[in-house]
């Protein structure tokens, strides 16, 4: 009897996991299709009905996940912040030092590069998005996470110079990804770059730059980085 009961419980758990996985897949598909339509015809010109039609689902099925376009845009930010929160939690569990700082920056680069489409959408629609209630609070939501990332990189009670370098590394990663991964016309890109970098090249360069900065920051925080006085 116990064996049969356990088998039923196991099947129920497996079914729930499968259902949750399907929900997550559908949500991700909605986000991807919404991004495609927003890029093709603009955020304001895109309706939920068009998103549902592109997906091949009813509006009711779409409403189960998102009640409005604003909800979809909010989900982009929530997902990004959720990944940052997980990264910060991971970093706080690691021993402080250059290796942890490098690994955290490496993981941060991954998050930013995988969020490229979302960043491009937010950049193209700044006026519209920033006018929403969520848009107004986006940076205030990012600031405490930036402070937490900086603390993981430098350690607690780091000197101001070290914290500024940490912030510079974080912003350099996100800004560089937004610029070098942008789908700008070739003529415009050729004016500033001999050849567009591949994602692998961009990732390697960013990691090298961030690693150099993080190594200096860790030494500076521990008092091991010399400072040449002004003359």
Enumerate the predicted regions with their spans.
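Short, basic, alpha-helical segments at the C-terminal edge of helix-turn-helix-like DNA-binding modules
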Residues: 78-85
């Amino acid at each position: 009897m116990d064996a049969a009961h356990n088998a039923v419980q196991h099947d129920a758990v497996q079914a729930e996991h499968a259902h949750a996985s399907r929900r997550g897949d559908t949500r991700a598909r909605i986000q991807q299709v919404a991004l495609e339509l927003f890029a093709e015809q603009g955020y304001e010109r895109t309706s939920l009905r068009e998103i549902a039609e592109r997906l091949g689902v009813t509006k009711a099925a779409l409403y189960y996940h998102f009640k409005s376009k604003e909800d979809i845009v909010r989900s982009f930010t929530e997902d990004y912040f959720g990944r940052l929160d997980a990264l910060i939690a991971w970093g706080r569990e690691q021993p402080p030092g250059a290796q942890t700082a490098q690994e955290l920056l490496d993981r941060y680069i991954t998050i930013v590069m995988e969020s490229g489409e979302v960043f491009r959408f937010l950049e193209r629609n700044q006026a519209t998005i920033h006018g929403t209630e969520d848009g107004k609070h986006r940076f205030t939501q990012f600031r405490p996470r930036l402070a937490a990332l900086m603390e993981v990189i430098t350690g607690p009670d780091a000197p101001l110079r070290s914290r500024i370098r940490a912030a510079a590394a974080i912003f350099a990663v996100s800004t560089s990804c937004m610029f070098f991964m942008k789908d700008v016309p070739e003529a415009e890109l050729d004016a500033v770059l001999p050849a567009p970098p591949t994602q692998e090249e961009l990732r390697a360069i960013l990691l090298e730059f961030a690693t150099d900065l993080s190594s200096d920051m860790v030494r500076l925080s521990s008092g091991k980085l010399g400072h040449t006085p002004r003359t």
